[in-house]
Each structure stands twice: as C-alpha cells, then as structure tokens.
Amino acid sequence: MNRLFLFFSLLIGNTAVSQSVILTFTHEVNHQPMRANKAYYTAQGDTFTITKFKYYLSNFSFISETEENIRLSPEYFLVSEDSAASKKVVLTGLPLGRYKAVSFMIGVDSIMNCTGAQSGALDPIYGMFWTWNSGYIMAKLEGTSPASRVPDHSLQFHIGGYRGAHQSQRMVRLNAPFVVAAEKTAVINLVADAATWFNGATPIRFSETSGFMTPGTIGDRIADNYSHMFSVKSK
C-alpha cells in the first residue's frame, strides 16, 4: 500500500502544472517589413527612414477564458530591430489552461524607473537610460526625413522618463486565444508597426517635430500613438 501511494505521489509530483510561452515580434512600417534606410511615408505625406527602433516590454499577464488575470513574475525585455534574438521573448510559469488575451506594458514600471540604473536588459549600456534625467527611455525611434529642419535631417524620438504628470508607459491588451499544455510550448506571433508613432490620434509632421527627448506633452501623445502599434500576426 505504501509503495502504491509513493508511486502515485511521484507521478503527480512529476506532472507539469505550468509551461513556457514564447512571444515573437516582427517589425513593420505601414504593413511593410521594416528595413534599415528604406523610405516610408507617413499619413501626412512625409518621407522617412528608420535607422534605430527599440522598446522595453514588461509586466506581462495573461487573461484566461474565465477572465482570470494571471500575472507573471516581473521581467524586463528590450526588443530591438537590430537584434534577432531580442525579438523572441520567453515567459515561464504560466499555468496550464485556455487563454484569450495577453497584456503587457510598453516601458519600465515606476518602481524600476525611479530606482536608478539597473543591470540586465535595464543596463545603461543599451542606451535606454537618461543619465541627465531620472528614468528610462521606454521606446526609441531614430532615422531621417527630408522634412526634418535640423541640419542633418535626422529624426530622434526618445520617449520616456518622468516629470510631474508626464509618464510614458502604456499598457497593451491583445486578444490572442491559445492553449497552454504540458506537452507543448505555446507561441504567439506579434507585429509592431512603427508607422503608428506618427499616424495615430496625434499626427506628427516632421517639419514641426523632428524629435523629442524629454518627458512632456509631445512624448505623452506619441506614446498614446504607439500604444496601438501591436497586433497579433495572422497565420
């Protein structure tokens, strides 16, 4: 009897109750693949290129079919166009079951943002921490545009930091039905379209705004714009 009990105890103990989930990210501009120095157009008709595109993701949670919100342990990921490895985010510890949505923050939460420079993905070596202005850059887009009035026609949008009411983290929720099973790792493929930075509720004209690198109203509005840049990639 004791041996039988031990057998089933070991069997239950070895049964997985959680599994990993992989998020992959593809970058586009106006539904076209993002390519360095390729010319794109805003909805306002401005031509522009992108030379740098990166953003922080954190505070992941998943919503089950019964509307239970499963929050994962805090992790911070820096996704960058020039790093293929960064476009694959592996999240662990998600309980087995059926889910209908994923939620995450674009940026770094207030606790880490106000603690100062960190290590790992938050290491200042990645150029996403303002040493002269407390806080992290939540998202960065750089490039060029003939419409830019600065001498080299550059575009520099560094959105982040804290100053009074100006906080640029944005929460995203995407409907993405999937199943977490013990025998298989779920994969969710996401697309980030950089055109939304300039084509959202607040249209950006490069002749008027060719960059922004401090907390403020313009940064808030661009963050509102790019909070809509993510979608689930259709199969």
Would you name each region that the model predicts?
Residues M1-L23:
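Bacterial Sec-dependent N-terminal signal peptides
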Residues Q19-K235:
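A short, solvent-exposed, low-complexity linear motif enriched for acidic/polar residues
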